[in-house]
């Protein structure tokens, strides 16, 4: 009895676990160094549907696969900053894990390093990627990523699929969407994007589904 009372007293005297850091978000014009890097890497170039002045650096708090709090940076269209702040605030509250949201891993020299291909990112001046059902490499139309109005979330865990195929063979373990694993898109994540009017590629009609992809117009 004495040992039980002593243990209870010790537990009562223990400090509470540290509070989880509060969510933080901020947006700003792209710094000159980032503009230069995006241009040097060909992520932005003359002829893109938006200028560098139309893009913003969105900094948000997110929860990693290590259960820790991290700071991520996304290059997004100016009009996307407010809705995406709302979305990532909800994802942080839901404790939804994101593998990586590091600027250098998405756009810098680190983007060429093996293992840095599970990065959640937004802007990329490129055409929409054809369905894995085809062998094509371009569609002839701009992707919503080219406007900074789309986000890919955990690409490895949420592959772009069609006709039983994907363009990332390492994502094959995630073909089975009925067996949930950390980082896979959930209904609550879809609802978070839907609350700001953004659609999900996993809800496209037909066989082709882009499970990672969320955009302002649903395409």
Please describe what each predicted stretch is.
Residues 14-68:
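N-terminal module-boundary/linker segments of secreted carbohydrate-active enzymes
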Residues 16-27, 49-51, 81, 196-197, ...:
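Post-signal peptide N-terminal regions of Sec-secreted extracellular proteins
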Residues 40-46, 69-78, 135-138:
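N-terminal post-signal-peptidase region of extra-cytosolic proteins
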Residues 50-118:
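Active-site acidic/histidine clusters and adjacent loop/turn architecture
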Residues 63, 86-97, 126, 156-159, ...:
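Structured segments of extracytoplasmic/periplasmic soluble domains
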